[in-house]
Amino acid sequence: MRMRLMPLVSAALVLCVSGPSFTQEWVEFSSQEDRFTCIFPAPPKISDTAWTSEYGAVLPARVYSAAQGQSRYSLTVVDYNPVERLLVEKSWSCPPGTETCQGIGDWGLGYWKNDVRGAIVYATSKFLQRDVKMTHLMWNSQSLVQGQELQLTNNADLSRTFAAVYMHENKLIIMEATAPRGYPPPAVFTQSLGWLDESGRALRYSTMYINAPDVPKPAPRGAAPPNPNDRNDGAGANGGRGGQVR
């Protein structure tokens, strides 16, 4: 993992972070292990945790978090790569003849595929179970990796939360930025997300990347067309389109 200080010179970014929580430099952080890059207001703390998927698989996860005054920022990475093994093993203990014991298509032994396909929607639903008012929900992409973004008002104190959920190389990315009532919207954090290839270089795809089993993986921009047999079996550069503040 590496970090460097990056001046925020873009006028749009300055408008997003100006006010009580503004500083001249943020930390540009990258994780080769989790294959992402983004900016934080300070070097993030890193902690390990676990995530229970929609179908009950307990998956390893890592949280990167930082604070700036009363504003809080976090990025959680959930590794869905073990999900096939975990859910297949889970199916072995089901009563004989039940649906979850059948290895037919995407049912039974194949439930892990639906767990991966629905991971973004499931993570999004967890935000909506909080005491919040959702003011905006939109499809989005970062460097042509598809995902979803949310804007929420927290009912308890009227603080604002901007969240984003993406999935790349079977790693679920959950970003969350919360600023107090009256502060500028914390949109710059979720829109700074980028991807890294196996060598740690910035990555942008030539067509839309969809992290799902049986879906062909597109070639990186500038690379040769992908082999049609190269699919995201096993579970699965800035340029995202930010939504309006609602």
PLM ranges: what are they?
Residues 37-45, 50-57:
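Non-catalytic extracellular/lumenal accessory regions of secreted precursors
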Residues 30-32, 39-41, 47, 67, ...:
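A structural detector for beta-sheet-dominated domains
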